[in-house]
């Protein structure tokens, strides 16, 4: 099975540092962007399979990023990682961004976060294999 690439997007450096440390031994390639704009630049240069984004970021918020990714890269599995848990925001992300999962901050790395990302990779792989059948 080919290695999959996960792009994590968050404007908080401490979140990205924590993810880099915590995910170093995971069976997928990790890339990081500190804004929606930077994420779009990475998406133009790299083959991304999973996108994990914060919702509240300056300039381009997570919802705008999700909409663009859904339109330009519909095969990417989209996940929200956010401390912003207002129900209307969650429903908008689900409906407009067609997200696979919504993970709230703070998260439990071993019991919640890592398994969720692995499941997203498995989901991507199953979508791919079903498309080729």
Features from the language model and the residues they span:
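Short amphipathic alpha-helix used as the core "switch/output" element in two-component signaling
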Residues: 41, 63-75
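Active-site residues of response regulator receiver
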Residues: 10, 54
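Receiver (REC) domain active-site loop signature in two-component systems and cognate sites
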Residues: 57
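Acidic catalytic/metal-coordinating carboxylates
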Residues: 4, 34-38, 61-64
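Two-component/phosphorelay signaling modules centered on CheY-like receiver
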Residues: 4, 13-31
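Acidic, metal-coordinating helix/loop segments flanking the phosphotransfer/catalytic sites
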Residues: 32-50
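Alpha4 helix (beta4-alpha4-beta5 surface) of REC/receiver domains from two-component response regulators
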Residues: 64, 85-103, 111
């Amino acid at each position: 099975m080919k290695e999959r690439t996960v792009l994590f997007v968050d404007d908080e450096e401490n979140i990205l540092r924590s993810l880099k440390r915590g995910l170093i031994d995971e069976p997928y390639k990790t890339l990081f962007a500190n804004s929606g704009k930077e994420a779009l630049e990475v998406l133009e240069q790299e083959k991304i399979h999973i996108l994990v984004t914060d919702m509240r970021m300056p300039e381009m918020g997570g919802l705008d990023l999700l909409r663009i990714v859904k339109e330009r890269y519909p095969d990417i599995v989209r996940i929200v990682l956010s401390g912003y848990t207002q129900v209307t925001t969650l429903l908008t992300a689900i409906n407009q961004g067609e997200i696979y999962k919504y993970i709230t901050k703070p998260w439990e790395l071993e019991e919640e976060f890592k398994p969720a990302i692995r499941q997203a990779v498995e989901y991507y792989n199953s979508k791919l294999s079903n498309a080729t059948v």
